[in-house]
Amino acid sequence: MASRVLSAYVSRLPAAFAPLPRVRMLAVARPLSTALCSAGTQTRLGTLQPALVLAQVPGRVTQLCRQYSDMPPLTLEGIQDRVLYVLKLYDKIDPEKLSVNSHFMKDLGLDSLDQVEIIMAMEDEFGFEIPDIDAEKLMCPQEIVDYIADKKDVYE
């Protein structure tokens, strides 16, 4: 629908705007992505979608629009699934031995450097920094899930 409205609007532009070049581009969704849009309009970016835009439109006011609500709300189950997924991707952890209550050092045979790498991977996954004092206490996946749920205010 939006493409029909845009094409109808562009076709009604005065002849002075006719020689403006049209450019094919791809809209890519990114965390906190920004996109040019008309004033007061919000644009929802999906997967790679071609968009036809005018290279220059004199007199149009544009602003940056941010998408803050793109992610679904966190749940305890969702946090647990993401934590276990990140841990299963870690090459030093045997996925068959991994459970929510597996101790990193006692059950999985990891050392303190591996534990630091796991915490860094969790920071990347969830988008916030875990202080070293708190990171030293996180020795199993369930403790990580509880910590993230506490920091992100997730309660069920």
Swiss-Prot record:
Residues 1-68 form a transit peptide. Residues 77-152 form the Carrier domain. Phosphopantetheinylation at Ser-112 is essential for interactions with LYR motif-containing proteins. GO terms for cellular component: iron-sulfur cluster assembly complex; mitochondrial [2Fe-2S] assembly complex; mitochondrial inner membrane; mitochondrial matrix; mitochondrial membrane; mitochondrion; nucleoplasm; respiratory chain complex I. Pfam families: PP-binding. One of its GO terms (biological process) is protein lipoylation. The keyword Mitochondrion applies. GO terms for molecular function: acyl binding; acyl carrier activity; calcium ion binding; fatty acid binding; mitochondrial large ribosomal subunit binding; structural molecule activity. SUPFAM superfamilies: ACP-like. It is found in: Mitochondrion. PROSITE patterns: CARRIER (PS50075), PHOSPHOPANTETHEINE (PS00012). The modification N6-acetyllysine is found at residue 88. The keyword Lipid metabolism applies. The modification O-(pantetheine 4'-phosphoryl)serine is found at residue 112. InterPro entries: ACP (IPR003231), ACP-like_sf (IPR036736), PP-bd_ACP (IPR009081), Ppantetheine_attach_site (IPR006162). Keywords: Acetylation, Electron transport, Fatty acid biosynthesis, Fatty acid metabolism, Lipid biosynthesis, Lipid metabolism, Mitochondrion, Phosphopantetheine, Phosphoprotein, Respiratory chain, Transit peptide, Transport. Mammalian complex I is composed of 45 different subunits. Interacts with ETFRF1. Identified in a complex composed of MALSU1, MIEF1 upstream open reading frame protein and NDUFAB1; within the trimeric complex, MIEF1 upstream open reading frame protein functions as a bridging scaffold that interacts with MALSU1 on one side, and with NDUFAB1 on the other side. The complex interacts with the mitochondrial large ribosomal subunit. Interacts with alpha-1-microglobulin chain; this interaction is required for the maintenance of mitochondrial redox homeostasis. Carrier of the growing fatty acid chain in fatty acid biosynthesis. Accessory and non-catalytic subunit of the mitochondrial membrane respiratory chain NADH dehydrogenase (Complex I), which functions in the transfer of electrons from NADH to the respiratory chain. Accessory protein, of the core iron-sulfur cluster (ISC) assembly complex, that regulates, in association with LYRM4, the stability and the cysteine desulfurase activity of NFS1 and participates in the [2Fe-2S] clusters assembly on the scaffolding protein ISCU. Belongs to the acyl carrier protein (ACP) family. In contrast to other accessory subunits of complex I, NDUFAB1 is the only subunit that is essential for cell viability in HEK293T cells. Since knockout cells lack assembled complex I and die in galactose media, this suggests that the essential role of NDUFAB1 is independent of complex I. HAMAP family: Acyl_carrier. This is Acyl carrier protein, mitochondrial. The lineage of its organism: Eukaryota, Metazoa, Chordata, Craniata, Vertebrata.
